[in-house]
């Protein structure tokens, strides 16, 4: 049986990307709300979103709210499944530590 670390997804190896996916859940969230919730800069959040978008894990929608441009981000089904696998691998790795 392979070690559970092989189930970790490289797309989630930065704390911000992992936090971003967890924050999204099944909702579409405004960029500004994500920035505030994750306590990060526009630049760092934009980079994290771009990386996850390239992996197919998030979808980005741009539009306007009134006359103001807005960006919304949502986890894709592929992204939610990848996060579930990643978290399961982390839990399995942690179980080994907690059981000792």
Language-model features and meaning:
Residues 1-5, 22, 81-100:
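Amphipathic alpha-helical dimerization/coiled-coil segments
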Residues 4-44, 65-66, 70-72:
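N-terminal helix-turn-helix DNA-binding core of bacterial DNA-binding proteins
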Residues 33-35, 46, 72-73, 86-90, ...:
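Surface-exposed beta-strand edges and their flanking turn/coil or helix-capping segments
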Residues 49-53:
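Short, hydrophobic-biased segments on the C-terminal half of alpha helices
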Residues 56:
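Glycine-centered, phosphate/nucleic-acid-interacting loop/turn motifs that mediate DNA/RNA or nucleotide
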Residues 60:
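Short beta-strand "wing" residues that participate in macromolecule-binding interfaces
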Residues 65-86:
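Basic, amphipathic "hinge/linker" alpha-helix immediately C-terminal to the N-terminal HTH DNA-binding motif
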């Amino acid at each position: 049986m392979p070690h559970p670390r092989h189930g970790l997804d490289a797309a989630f190896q930065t704390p911000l990307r992992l936090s971003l996916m967890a924050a999204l859940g099944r909702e579409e969230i405004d960029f500004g709300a994500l920035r505030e919730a994750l306590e990060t800069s526009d630049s760092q959040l934009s980079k994290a979103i771009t990386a996850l978008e390239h992996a197919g894990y998030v979808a980005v929608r741009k539009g306007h709210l009134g006359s103001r441009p807005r960006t919304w981000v949502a986890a894709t089904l592929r992204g939610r499944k990848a996060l579930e696998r990643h978290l399961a691998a982390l839990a399995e790795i942690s179980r080994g530590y907690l059981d000792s």
